[in-house]
């Protein structure tokens, strides 16, 4: 029996989150190596969802009819949906833990409609 593998795609919002965080790291901490590697690290975390992406918790909110899942990774939270028909995971947001992520996601969803 072969394991189903999913393709990872990034919504514009998740790409903007990663870009904004990378810029923050570079400007605030002047930690060039971590800042330059931030996107790579987050993409590696997302790549782990290629197998069994539904193994993480749902947050109780929907995006375009799909359940939103949350994957904690280090000090970040990855929010994504799973389209089983196309075998695709779509990364929606990448947020720092400790933020009011529920408010951020709800506000973002209102603007996405």
What are the residue ranges of the model-derived segments?
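Solvent-exposed, flexible loop/coil residues
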Residues: 12, 60-63, 99
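Conserved protein kinase catalytic domain
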Residues: 22, 43-46, 95
């Amino acid at each position: 029996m072969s394991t189903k593998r999913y393709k990872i795609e990034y919504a514009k919002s998740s790409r903007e989150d990663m870009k904004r965080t990378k810029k923050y790291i570079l400007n605030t901490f002047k930690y060039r190596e971590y800042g330059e590697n931030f996107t790579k690290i987050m993409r590696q975390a997302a790549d782990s969802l290629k197998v069994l992406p539904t193994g993480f918790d749902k947050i109780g909110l929907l995006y375009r009819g799909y359940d939103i899942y949350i994957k904690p990774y280090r000090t970040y939270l990855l929010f994504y949906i799973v389209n089983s028909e196309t075998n695709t995971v779509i990364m929606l947001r990448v947020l720092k833990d400790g933020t009011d992520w529920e408010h951020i996601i709800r506000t973002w969803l209102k603007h996405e409609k």
